[in-house]
């Protein structure tokens, strides 16, 4: 399976929604504590195990997350450790990038998510305890959402409702928001420890998953959220990212500081259906391809990016 070695520690990996062979990777020097960052755009070789870098962009601070535009196939957005949000166009020569840079967050930007239904806006979340809404044609953020009492590690759009998003915070709450409303519409005390990630089910717009420092992944139904639908135990340390499959309703991927990537089917009794122990440092980034069913990617502090098919060994050549 394809493996890419980056010079810095991996933080995030995202498949392109337009090209099945293209990925973007966010990396940071010195584990994101101090130093530069780099964004890599990778291409999978058709019918071969190789992966090549088509372009890279250096940043003066760590890159914690990256996402692709849902409306322009060459555009990606990066969340930077200096509080900035930068937009890149891979169709332009590297010296022309970034094409835009926004400096509004007061602390590190932890996540960025492009609206999959409206296709003209995106969210960022930050260690400054806020979530910001941005429009591609605006010179500044459209709105700032300030309710969380601690770092907002991730904010993600609902896949079916273009005005609804969820945010996961170190204040131990999961919040549901509608951008048409003045405040959050729902507050779920989802874990007793910091919540590091959240994601919506791609087939049921009322179901979402959270992951936490408490080593669990939990599945929630916003129509009845006093008790989780499922609690998934199996990781040995904090669960850094959680991601619902775009192809199978009940399939969830997660990655952890225990260096593993796990696959779960939350609707069956023995929920842990796959475990991959290919990373040798914290596994912190995971994605599943929308265009190729079963294709997964992960990255971690071991500076490696793996791309593999579910059920295969990520390290197999």
From Swiss-Prot:
Pfam families: Beta-prop_EIPR1, WD40. One of its GO terms (cellular component) is cytosol. It comes from the Eukaryota. InterPro entries: G-protein_beta_WD-40_rep, PEX7, WD40/YVTN_repeat-like_dom_sf, WD40_repeat_CS, WD40_repeat_dom_sf, WD40_rpt. SMART domains: WD40. Expressed in siliques and leaves, but barely detectable in flowers, stems and roots. The keyword DNA damage does not apply. Keywords: Cytoplasm, Peroxisome, Peroxisome biogenesis, Protein transport, Receptor, Repeat, Transport, WD repeat. It is found in: Cytoplasm, Cytosol; Peroxisome matrix. Interacts with PEX5; interaction only takes place when PEX7 is associated with cargo proteins. Interacts with PEX13 (via N-terminus) and PEX12 (via C-terminus), but not with PEX14. PANTHER family: PEROXISOMAL TARGETING SIGNAL 2 RECEPTOR. Belongs to the WD repeat peroxin-7 family. The binding of a cargo to PEX7 is necessary but not sufficient for the targeting of the complex to the peroxisome. PEX12, PEX13 and PEX14 play a critical role in this targeting. PEX7 is required for PEX5 stability in light-grown seedlings. This is Peroxisome biogenesis protein 7. It comes from Arabidopsis thaliana (Mouse-ear cress). The gene is PEX7.
């Amino acid at each position: 399976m394809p493996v890419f070695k980056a010079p810095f520690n991996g933080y995030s990996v995202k498949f392109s929604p337009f090209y099945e062979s293209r990925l973007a990777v966010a990396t940071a020097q010195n584990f994101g504590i101090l130093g530069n960052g780099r964004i890599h755009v990778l291409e999978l070789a058709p019918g071969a195990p190789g992966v090549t870098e088509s372009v890279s962009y250096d940043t003066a601070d760590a890159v914690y997350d990256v996402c692709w535009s849902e409306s322009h196939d060459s555009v990606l957005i990066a969340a930077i450790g200096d509080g900035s949000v930068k937009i890149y166009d891979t169709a332009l020569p590297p010296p022309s990038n970034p094409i835009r840079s926004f400096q509004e967050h007061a602390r590190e930007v932890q996540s960025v998510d492009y609206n999959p239904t409206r296709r003209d806006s995106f969210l960022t979340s930050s260690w400054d305890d806020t979530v910001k809404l941005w429009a591609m044609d605006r010179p500044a953020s459209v709105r700032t959402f300030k309710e969380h009492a601690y770092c907002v590690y991730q904010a993600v759009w609902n896949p079916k409702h273009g005005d609804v998003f969820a945010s996961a915070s170190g204040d131990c709450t999961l919040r549901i928001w509608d951008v048409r409303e003045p405040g959050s519409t729902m507050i779920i005390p989802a874990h007793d420890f910091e919540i590091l990630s959240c994601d919506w089910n791609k087939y049921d717009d009322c179901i979402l998953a959270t992951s936490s420092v408490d080593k669990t992944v939990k599945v929630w139904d916003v129509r009845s959220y006093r008790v989780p639908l499922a609690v998934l135990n199996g990781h040995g340390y904090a669960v850094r990212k959680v991601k619902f499959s775009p192809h199978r309703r009940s399939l969830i991927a997660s990655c952890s500081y225990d260096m593993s990537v796990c696959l779960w089917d939350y609707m069956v009794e023995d929920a842990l259906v796959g475990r991959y122990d290919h990373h040798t440092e914290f596994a912190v980034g995971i994605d599943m391809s929308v265009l190729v069913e079963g294709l997964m990617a992960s990255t971690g502090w071991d500076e490696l990016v793996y791309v593999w098919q579910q059920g295969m060994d990520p390290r197999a050549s």
